[in-house]
A protein has these predicted regions:
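Active-site neighborhoods and metal-handling regions in enzymes and metal-associated proteins
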Residues: 1-250
Length: 250
């Protein structure tokens, strides 16, 4: 079975000899390792993860599809690999690489390879990632199930007198306690007239009143895969107007 990096290189034009991946999410997708730093260099016949001393032990233990190299002088290491594989054209992540990072890369290796900063690499990565394996689907389902379980816990607790901030923290804690590695995004919890704001900010000063709406927008991360759900509930008995509005939005 092909590795993800082998699949990626197959999707790139034949004129591309290698690809450099530096964004956190794509690095994790292709190596299976979560880190805040590291560089993946993929060639037609090999792939490398260059990573600093903070992550080297973990990388050597869990990364299977790349040769792991401890970072010393990053650009010297990249140069050596480009020369070793006789690469002439390298694709970069145009959507995520900063201008400063691109300028530094070009200054260091521009005499060896032509840097392709078109959308060719980003498009190939998107194509790889949009087709989910059964294992990926299971992780997505697990993230959603975790969020739903957290919501059930919060609904059992929810009552008049708590603040929007209380609800936010309760949801966050429930998801993390259930095993989420992170939150999909900052949790939104709003009540009363603020529920008309899709992306409002929870406030400590806003208190849930009897018979009021509470809107919650939240999600959990499981093994790098995110869930995202929005739910609106009524704390107490809704008025007929509230029922009509709720059903219209539904």
């Amino acid at each position: 079975m092909q590795t993800r990096l082998e699949q990626l290189m197959q999707k790139l034009p034949a004129s591309i000899d290698c690809a450099i991946i530096t964004s956190d999410v794509n690095r994790r997708y292709f190596t299976g390792m979560r880190s805040s730093a590291g560089t993946v260099l993929a060639f037609r016949d090999a792939a490398y993860l260059i990573i600093d001393f903070r992550y080297i032990e973990k990388a050597r233990a869990c990364v299977k599809d790349c040769q792991v190299m401890e970072q010393s002088n990053l650009y010297q290491q990249i140069t050596a690999l480009l020369e070793q594989h006789q690469a002439k054209r390298m694709a970069v992540e145009a959507e995520t690489m900063t201008i400063q990072a691109f300028a530094s890369l070009k200054q260091q290796v521009g005499n060896l390879v032509e840097l392709d900063c078109s959308d060719v690499l980003s498009d190939a990565i998107s194509h790889c990632r949009r087709i989910k394996s059964e294992q990926e689907l299971q992780k997505m389902r697990a993230a959603q199930q975790l969020a739903e379980t957290a919501l059930e816990q919060v609904l059992q607790w929810l009552h008049p007198g708590v603040t929007e901030r209380d609800i936010q923290l309760k949801l966050d804690f429930a998801m993390l306690q259930l095993g989420a590695e992170d939150l999909s995004f900052p949790t939104i919890a709003l009540t009363g007239t603020k529920t008309s704001m899709p992306h409002g900010v929870p406030e400590e000063s806003v208190v849930v009143q009897p018979g009021s709406f509470v809107l919650m927008d939240f999600g959990a991360v499981v093994d790098g895969y995110h869930s995202d759900m929005t739910r609106t509930v009524c704390v107490g008995s809704p008025t007929e107007t509230m029922r009509q509005v709720y059903n219209v939005v539904l």
